[in-house]
Amino acid sequence: MDKPRHERQWAHGADLIVSQLEAQGVRQVFGIPGAKIDKVFDSLLDSSIRIIPVRHEANAAFMAAAVGRITGKAGVALVTSGPGCSNLITGMATANSEGDPVVALGGAVKRADKAKLVHQSMDTVAMFSPVTKYAVEVTASDALAEVVSNAFRAAEQGRPGSAFVSLPQDIVDGPASGSTLPASRAPQMGAAPDGAVDSVAQAIAAAKNPIFLLGLMASQPENSRALHRHAGKKPYSGHQHLSGAGAVNQDNFARFAGRVGLFNNQAGDRLLRQADLIICIGYSPVEYEPAMWNSGTATLVHIDVLPAYEERNYVPDIELVGDIAATLEKLAQRIEHRLVLTPQAADILADRQRQRELLDRRGAQLNQFALHPLRIVRAMQDIVNSDVTLTVDMGSFHIWIARYLYSFRARQVMISNGQQTMGVALPWAIGAWLVNPQRKVVSVSGDGGFLQSSMELETAVRLHANILHIIWVDNGYNMVAIQEQKKYQRLSGVEFGPVDFKVYAEAFGACGFAVESAEALEPTLRAAMDVDGPAVVAIPVDYRDNPLLMGQLHLSQIL
């Protein structure tokens, strides 16, 4: 039995908080100080933790989320009371939906002032509870370490997400007693039970057209590696949701049907409609609504660390709950024969491969200006090699990128799908670069999404972050526009004015570029990639083919 831990006296609760953050292995915190939380910022000066001041609290959560997604360890946001916390909530809701581990510490008024009408008083626990895995206010100084420790456990374990801790000012500023808790390791799960794994192996053996649907958790590096080993021995037909980008490597590309989502009209969607067995790996319904892809005729298997969240269109016949990688290894040992594609599945995969080759050969020949989306995607494919991390904002461009730009490294591409939040790309890029400063990061947004977080260009310049941000410019919220046009045959609230993004970037101290002709696209991107530090490239885009995205688009219609 463990002995009681030695209780230490701390001059300030903030000192115990910071000590607990160090014990958790935190390397940096993102945030904006204020009177209710400034003692924690002061204590951080005497720690090993780097303070990254940001320009908006939501972006602190986005940056922390990128750290969490790439490392598996929760990133940390630190904000003051009232609007400091309310500004944070979009970032926390996004992290929770995307499965990104984030711990946010928010200042609060003194406990004695909670029921008074005082400056910045707000029930932040009630506000954060619906959009986090864990939301708690510390009510006694001797509970500081355990509350913070449990926030990290909640954020990192199971399906990761966000956690929020409210810190009243009197607890932060006043003396505290307590001891730092060691960072707990996630309990090591085993593989799913043998009987359930045997049932899935038998279902695979009996299936004529099995398919894997890879969700967010499938792209965790250890799970992705297990998939690669499994697929190398027993090739399968599979595809990934947008959230699972990078889960399939190049060696298995011949049986990869691409990414699915949004309009239910991709090669993977066609395979799903033909499948008699659908094996969902690391999938959550928030990633792709089951009603969009599950007709109810196929046997449904759920492989994840958590039981399925059931709904009318997602009731698995078999659930393999346990460590995903270990479960896949066990399942692979029970599959005795190579999986043979049906002629229909083989035709779908071959056609997808032909379309990829068509884009590779002819994409650069789309010479209109403003530029066709496929021309930009083709040029981006040349600069996004395996050493580059790509963060993608939300807008029409993200559909073109998700469908036609390929990546083969787990967590190489970050796409928002749970909330489809605009403005994530640049702060995500900053967080990703801080994790791997030796890697170039390319972020991409539309001109609408960019201005929702473009103030963080100053943060990127201050850090000398090696980031290239690409802006697809069309002076409108086009993804909304194409849907409005289809539904109502007219547009409302989707148009806005131009910005000189080259000058805008230079005003922050970044290098600014503007593509001014079709032939200038590739040279400009190469020049921007060569910049050591933040660079911004503005590319005018012609979205007139966007309505095709909602239909049965074949690239031969364009190329």
UniProtKB/Swiss-Prot annotation:
Top-level lineage group: Bacteria
Coiled-coil ranges per UniProt: none
Binding site for Mg(2+): 447
Enzyme class, spelled out: transferase
Pfam family of the protein (one): TPP_enzyme_C
Sites where the protein binds FAD: 159, 263-284, 304-323
Enzyme Commission code: 2.2.1.6
Gene Ontology CC, one term: acetolactate synthase complex
Entries under InterPro entries matching the protein: Acetolactate_synth_catblc, DHS-like_NAD/FAD-binding_dom, THDP-binding, Thiamin_PyroP_enz_cen_dom, Thiamin_PyroP_enz_TPP-bd_dom, TPP-bd_CS, TPP_enz, TPP_enzyme_TPP-bd
Keyword Metal-binding assigned: yes
N-terminal signal peptide: none
Sequence intervals crossing the membrane: none
Gene Ontology biological process terms from the UniProt entry: butanediol metabolic process; isoleucine biosynthetic process; L-valine biosynthetic process
Pathway where this protein functions: Polyol metabolism; (R,R)-butane-2,3-diol biosynthesis; (R,R)-butane-2,3-diol from pyruvate: step 1/3
Catalytic function, reaction form: 2 pyruvate + H(+) = (2S)-2-acetolactate + CO2
Molecular function GO terms recorded: acetolactate synthase activity; flavin adenine dinucleotide binding; magnesium ion binding; thiamine pyrophosphate binding
Assembly behavior: Homodimer.
Family note: Belongs to the TPP enzyme family.
Protein name as catalogued: Acetolactate synthase, catabolic
Organism lineage: Bacteria, Pseudomonadati, Pseudomonadota, Gammaproteobacteria, Enterobacterales
Gene name in the database record: budB
